Design a protein with these regions (language model features):
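N-terminal beta1-alpha1 cap of cysteine-dependent amidohydrolase-like domains
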Residues: 1-210, 215-253
């Protein structure tokens, strides 16, 4: 795991250095959050409930997605700081659609089950569905913060109008459902140059202290002397979360 997620680990450590804290990473197998754990008394759930923040990284495929969404739901409802990267952003959208919009069949076109949907995450229009190799949206891309609504993430980028980060994906938030999601409180504060592709999602600060998703992979440009802004935000929120709880941990599930 340390090799597979090395960039994420380093980004967390860099943010910890800036905050003067040692970051302890607790790995959770998302499959263990799924079936048979309704009482939330498994070791995986104990780890999740003891965490000061939650990071769901990029990934592929349906395996483990239900467990990841249960973890995201926990973080959202219990106000635990959350950062979703790429797939972690897309799953946050589906979780919100299922549990807030009550679209219980909401899913992604990536899921092998191929259900009837509604598909809140879809193939990007420029992607050739018949060829999975060599057709991803790759490399550095610019994300533009919206100027008509406040953003929790923007101050960590010194309120710059935009930022650049590397991308690696072939799916995106379905633009057909953006208006509905925003009406229910899930705000898309960053978009690509077209204004159609969603790049950053957030819950308002009065609703949640730090609930952020990015389509990009900001961990790749994190450095010890210049930590990645979203990870700085996550760690700062996690510190505040721990301080607010004192020595007691959240026990809801």
């Amino acid at each position: 795991l340390t090799d597979a997620y090395l960039s994420l680990m380093k980004a967390l450590q860099h943010a910890g250095y800036q905050a003067g804290r040692k970051i302890v990473i607790s790995w959770i197998e998302s499959d263990a959050l799924e079936e048979g754990n309704e009482l939330c008394d498994s070791e995986a759930w104990k780890k999740l409930k003891a965490a000061d923040g939650l990071l769901v990284p990029g990934g592929f495929g349906e395996r483990g997605s239900e467990g990841k969404m249960r973890a995201i739901s926990y973080a959202r409802t219990q106000r635990v700081p959350y950062l979703g990267i790429c797939y972690g952003m897309q799953l946050a959208v589906i979780e919100y659609a299922r549990n807030v919009l009550e679209e219980k069949q909401a899913d992604s076109e990536e899921f092998e089950a191929g259900g009837a949907g509604p598909h809140f995450v879809v193939y990007m229009p420029e992607i050739d569905r018949g060829q999975l190799g060599g057709n991803m949206r790759l490399g550095g891309r610019t994300t533009y913060f919206r100027q008509d609504i406040p953003s929790l993430l923007s101050p960590f980028y010194q309120n710059a109008p935009s930022f650049s980060a590397r991308h690696r994906h072939r799916y995106e938030v379905n633009p057909e459902y953006v208006e509905r999601l925003e009406a229910a409180g899930l705000m898309f504060t960053g978009k690509d140059e077209s204004g159609v592709r969603m790049e950053v999602l957030e819950l308002r600060e009065d609703v949640h202290p730090f609930f952020v998703g990015l389509q990009a992979h900001p961990e790749y440009t994190s450095r010890p002397n210049k930590p990645s802004p979203p990870f700085v935000g996550l760690i700062q929120a996690a510190i505040q979360h721990r301080q607010s709880l004192g020595t007691s941990a959240s026990t809801a599930c």
